[in-house]
A protein has these predicted regions:
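Solvent-exposed, acidic/polar segments of extracytosolic/periplasmic ligand-binding ectodomains
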Residues: 380-448
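N-terminal export signals
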Residues: 2-5, 11-35
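Extracytoplasmic ligand/sensor domains, especially the bilobed periplasmic-binding protein
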Residues: 39-40, 70, 116, 128-236, ...
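Short, well-structured alpha-helical segments in soluble
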Residues: 108, 112-130, 196, 246-256
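C-terminal segment of N-terminal export signals and the immediately downstream linker at the start
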Residues: 28-54
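Signal peptide-proximal N-terminal region
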Residues: 70-105
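Extracellular/periplasmic ligand-binding modules, especially the Venus flytrap/periplasmic-binding
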Residues: 266-269, 321-379
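Short beta-strand segments enriched in small/hydrophobic residues
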Residues: 48-67, 204-207
Length: 448
């Protein structure tokens, strides 16, 4: 069984690596618990309902995982209170305190940024802790694995930070939903900015994380930059958590490439970017051009780790704490008051997913996955920091504006590290629901 502790700011930081955490409650859920007339997996019958937060508490993406846990705790506080943060700016006003008359508690697991560990962790939360929904993660490999498990188990999966096209493409599932954007959107938004700043006809070297997200990101960048004459001279796969990337960077020096695209994330991006700059790549001239580096998927946490190496480097992001819409300001204020620093995009997307799930349950009047899913499908909303957004029914992918950013040359603080250079309208990153392959299939409500 999972250990339950009283959660506050100190305990979240102290127990960030714990196997599971829950808000203090006298009621413990058992597998297959039922409410009257509710015959679906883990239907709650007491006065509480349990969410399962599955995040990387160890491994290369642990910084994102820690921020996700902070955001989830804040979201649970706001859901139970019926207000606070972006719940006050959210266009849906269904949540007024708890969900369907029940207080939300939660348990957590460590994905370790490994698919097998993530599935095992999610399975424990579903079977041992009665989790009605699983959410979280910072790896697309993990997301796809856990999404498949949740489909089999009959619970909803609200994906965390997952950027591979496959999550809502060929590996989409009816029980899975993604708020975060994907590599297709990154390519569409980022390529015009790269052309405007670096021109056409460049020789490109890709270093790519060797799993579904890296492959997807590499492919999307190639798709949108090759028409402007950006030719791939090499695409080299690197293991997640490599640490030392020198053996992968050395061959770039004599490759004839004048552009390096780092399809890395988390500590891997911090290490590979820092080492590429230390090797002098940004000081080189090749083919009569200044050598440039591109990081397609950025986060403030990564830039914080990379320091000066990230200055002036372009990328994309799902959200940034400097946005001035009412939702973003409310979230930054609430998160900052609780933790003392601004939230990351990982924190933002996971907070949104918790709110969106709770709201859908409230609007549906049940926690039954098929009914909750229908409440999310083609749901139009605003007030959660990304502008007008739609949860498309065809693939369970959110569509919203995309931010193109670059590392600030003269940051005013250790958090003021990214500059938003363009907000790409949602219409420019939309695509047909069947373009990326895959089928949702039927909902699974699970066995009671």
């Amino acid at each position: 069984m999972s250990k339950k502790i009283i959660v506050n700011r100190r305990s979240v930081l102290k127990y960030g690596g714990a196997a599971s955490v829950a808000l203090a409650t006298p009621y413990f859920f058992t597998r297959g618990a039922l409410a009257a007339g509710e015959n679906y997996r883990n239907a709650p019958k007491g006065d509480t309902v349990t969410f399962g937060f599955n995040v990387p508490q160890t491994g290369a993406y642990a910084d994102e995982g820690a921020d996700e846990l902070r955001a989830y705790e804040l979201a649970v506080e706001h859901i139970n209170a019926g207000g606070g943060g972006m719940l006050d700016t959210f266009t849906s006003k269904a949540l007024t305190g708890g969900v369907n008359g029940k207080k939300v508690t939660f348990v957590t697991g460590d994905t370790q940024t490994k698919s097998d560990a993530a599935r095992a962790s999610a399975k424990r939360m579903i079977e041992n802790d009665g989790a009605i929904m699983i959410t979280g993660g910072s790896s697309s490999g993990v997301a796809i694995a856990v999404q498949g498990l949740c489909q089999e188990a009959g619970v909803i999966f609200m994906a965390g930070l997952t950027h591979s096209n496959d999550t809502t493409g060929k590996d989409r599932r009816a029980n899975g939903f993604r708020h975060f954007f994907n590599t297709e959107m990154t390519g569409a938004a980022l390529a015009p900015v790269l052309e405007n700043n670096y021109g056409r006809d460049r020789k490109v070297y890709h270093l790519t994380a060797d799993y579904t997200w890296g492959w997807s990101q590499e492919g999307s960048i190639q798709k949108y930059t090759e028409p402007m004459g950006w030719e791939t001279v090499a695409a080299v796969r690197t293991p997640v958590g490599a640490g030392d990337f020198s053996q992968y960077i050395t061959p770039i020096l004599n490759s004839g490439a004048d552009t390096l695209v780092l399809n890395h994330y988390g500590k891997d991006m911090v290490n590979s970017l820092t080492q590429a700059v230390q090797f002098g790549l940004r000081d080189k001239q090749v083919n009569g051009k200044d050598f440039v580096i591109v990081v397609p998927l950025y986060s403030r946490l990564m830039v914080q780790g990379a320091g000066d190496a990230a200055k002036g480097i372009f990328g994309s992001t799902n959200w940034h704490w400097s946005l001035q819409d009412e939702g973003s300001k409310a979230f930054v204020k609430a998160f900052g008051e609780k933790y003392g620093f601004p939230p990351s995009q990982a924190a933002h997307t996971t907070y949104c997913q918790a709110i969106l799930y709770a709201d859908a349950c409230q609007r549906a009047g049940t926690f039954r996955p098929s009914e909750v899913g229908k409440a999310l499908e083609d749901f139009d909303f605003d007030g959660l920091g990304n502008g007008p957004t739609t949860y498309r029914a065809g693939d369970h992918q959110c569509f919203k504006d995309v931010l193109v950013v670059k590392g600030k040359e003269n940051p005013s603080s250790k958090f003021d590290l990214l500059e938003v250079v363009e907000v790409t309208p949602r219409a420019k990153v939309e695509y047909p629901a069947d373009m990326l392959g895959g089928e949702l299939g039927p909902y699974n409500d699970g066995e009671a």
